[in-house]
């Protein structure tokens, strides 16, 4: 019954998002990395350094939580999130590529992960139901979001009270498949998020930044785009 209710909420979220006229958002004022693979690194290598457990610990992901795995790819985190939140928790695994979504759905069914749902999102809208998630996890994919302000704006209402967006990325230029922390903070704050925690995570290839929805979400036409400028000489 709980799974059916969750799936119904996802369906309603998709219908609501499609029915409304799309507002105008500013484009990203920096390069956007292309999607080159559904996997960031080999799962066995990641498990050798206990990556997923360490990230979930830092993110405060506990049994019974509802978590969205955005840009889930082949499901490295999806599988481990399912184990962490347990039968009383829920995991939504989302990707924007239909073929990746389909392969992940096959894996979820094969491994009988009854607390996991798999959903197709849009580049500028994760299509998540409002006030539904304790954590939203994005690992090594933020730099691939083609419309970050639109995406983050639509994501904002999906957090529950006390919910957090957890971003893991490399501290390098976006065109090199990373996001400089100051640029990330600027883009997040521009859409109404607030930085609540920052940790270096060399074992996961970069850093972890946690944001809540404590700021006010502006109207789309009031969002001021960010860019890292080279200092004047």
Please describe what each predicted stretch is:
Residues 12-14:
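C-terminal motif of bacterial Sec signal peptides marking the signal peptidase cleavage site
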Residues 16-68, 76:
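Class I SAM-dependent transferase core
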Residues 68, 72-126:
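Class I SAM-dependent methyltransferase SAM/SAH-binding core
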Residues 82-83, 149-164:
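A short glycine-rich, Lys/Arg-flanked "PGG" loop and its adjoining helix->strand segment in the class I
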Residues 126-136:
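A short acidic, Gly/Pro-enriched loop at the edge of an enzyme's catalytic core
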Residues 134-148:
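A short SAM/SAH-binding and catalytic strip from SAM-dependent methyltransferases
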Residues 164-187:
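Conserved class I S-adenosyl-L-methionine
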Residues 201-233:
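Core SAM-dependent methyltransferase catalytic element
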């Amino acid at each position: 019954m709980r799974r059916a209710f969750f799936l119904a909420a996802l369906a309603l979220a998709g219908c609501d998002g499609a029915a409304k006229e799309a507002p105008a958002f500013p484009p990203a004022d920096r390069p956007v990395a292309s999607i080159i693979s559904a996997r960031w690194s080999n799962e066995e290598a990641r498990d050798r350094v206990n990556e997923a457990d360490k990230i979930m610990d830092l993110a405060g992901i506990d049994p019974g939580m509802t978590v969205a795995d955005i840009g889930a790819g082949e499901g490295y985190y999806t599988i481990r999130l399912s184990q962490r939140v347990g039968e009383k928790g829920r995991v939504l695994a989302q990707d924007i590529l239909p073929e990746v979504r389909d392969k992940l759905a096959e894996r979820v069914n094969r491994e009988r992960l009854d607390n996991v749902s798999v959903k197709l999102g849009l580049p500028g809208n994760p299509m998540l139901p409002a006030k539904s998630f304790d954590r939203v996890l994005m690992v090594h994919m933020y730099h691939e979001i083609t419309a970050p302000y639109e995406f983050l704006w639509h994501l904002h209402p999906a957090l529950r009270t006390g919910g957090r967006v957890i971003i893991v990325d490399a501290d390098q230029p976006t065109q090199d498949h990373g996001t400089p922390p100051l640029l990330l903070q600027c883009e997040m704050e521009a859409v109404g998020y607030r930085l609540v925690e920052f940790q270096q995570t060399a074992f996961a290839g970069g850093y972890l930044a946690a944001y809540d929805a404590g700021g006010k979400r502006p109207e789309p036409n009031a969002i001021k785009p960010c860019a890292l400028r080279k200092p004047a000489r």
